[in-house]
């Protein structure tokens, strides 16, 4: 998997970083950015992942924007890849350095393996169900804090209802630091290694969260529903 992500990064993603023309940046579904690099990277990832498991299904963020029915693959009795070719597209399109490739392998909604790859740093974060979380093949365990004033977290409020957004504002007055990278892959990694204690998220698209959820779980963290 490291070779696949490295090659896609070197051949497709990084050549476009800070080098996108205006016609290579567009919007899908009205407000979500998509770049030529997202589209081409997803095609290449799909081709390579289906070579690994030829009978598996594939759900990619860009493919979903054209065909929402592909989410039904999660209900089938088969393996399924879930991919976000560039998590943090807004950062990528604006020349900011926090973006990642996110991949997960599931079977009937059970997450089996996941990978989060940081192209600029050439760092692979991965997880195997019941076996642990790893950074460049070194096993890691998260650490927390019992002191609320030392807590650092992320809150994404873009898609919350206005009333719930107001309730979340209280966290900014309690914790040491609350911010967002605008790249959930980076935030999951930070939680896994203990640099961040929590993330409160509002948009739960599978490609944004399935890879990171397994990484955090296997590092010793947890995920819960607030509402």
Annotate each predicted stretch with a short phrase.
Residues 60-62, 137, 182:
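Short loop/edge segments at beta-strand edges and connector loops
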Residues 71-134:
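DPxDG-like acidic metal-binding loop motif
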């Amino acid at each position: 998997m490291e070779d696949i992500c490295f090659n896609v990064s070197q051949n497709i993603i990084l050549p476009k970083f800070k080098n996108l023309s205006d016609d290579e940046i567009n919007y899908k579904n009205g407000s979500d950015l998509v770049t030529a690099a997202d589209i081409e990277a997803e095609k290449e990832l799909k081709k390579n992942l289906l070579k690994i498991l030829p009978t598996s299904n594939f759900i990619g963020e860009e493919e979903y924007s054209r065909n929402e029915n592909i989410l039904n693959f999660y209900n089938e009795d088969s393996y399924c890849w879930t991919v976000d070719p560039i998590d943090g597209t807004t950062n990528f399109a604006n020349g900011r350095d926090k973006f990642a490739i996110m991949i997960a392998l599931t079977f009937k909604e059970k997450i089996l393996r996941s990978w989060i790859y940081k192209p600029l740093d050439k760092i692979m974060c991965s997880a195997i169900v019941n076996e642990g979380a790893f950074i460049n093949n070194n096993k890691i365990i998260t650490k927390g804090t019992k002191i609320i004033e030392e807590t650092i977290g992320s809150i994404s409020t873009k898609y919350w209802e206005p009333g719930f957004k107001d309730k979340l504002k209280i966290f900014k007055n309690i914790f040491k630091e609350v911010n967002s990278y605008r790249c959930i892959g980076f935030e999951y990694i930070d939680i896994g290694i203990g640099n961040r204690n929590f993330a409160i998220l509002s948009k739960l698209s599978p490609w944004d969260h399935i890879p990171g959820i397994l990484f955090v779980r296997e590092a010793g963290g947890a995920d819960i529903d607030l509402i």
